Amino acid sequence: MYRFYVSSYAKGKEKGLYVCTLDETKNELHLNKHIPTEDFPSYVIKKDDFLYVSLKDARVGEGGGVASYHIEEDDLKQLSFYNSHGRSYTHLCLSPDQKYLFTANYHVGATAAFPLKDHKIGDKLSVVHHHGSGIDLLKRQTSPHAHYV
């Protein structure tokens, strides 16, 4: 049996995180639990018994950010949430010693670092706002877009 996690941008009550399993002996996928979230979960990192999740703002400037969860069998217990007030993170990365969480923000072209203590996300330590533009200035390359960190 393999357990895995799915993030969903679904509208209404369906948005959130899903705990699923794959039963290789029967070639079956199972949806074990839905964990609702206020914002749209996006990028997910699983490390040991913890999930780190980027959340896209679903509350018009009031939400978005990053959250950490403790994995408890077929459930997730939220440990922390950093509200980015409308800013959503495209990609996440953990430091090898798991003391820091790094984020990339596509929409504002920035990267940031957060401290982790007992897998809880602390206040932002540092932000780097990138500068520049692409060759297509009429459409979508008028500013930087961080894709990955």
What residues fall within each predicted segment?
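Residue-level recognition of a conserved intra-blade site in WD40 beta-propeller repeats
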Residues: 43-46, 94
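Residue position within the beta-strands of beta-propeller blades
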Residues: 6, 52-54, 103
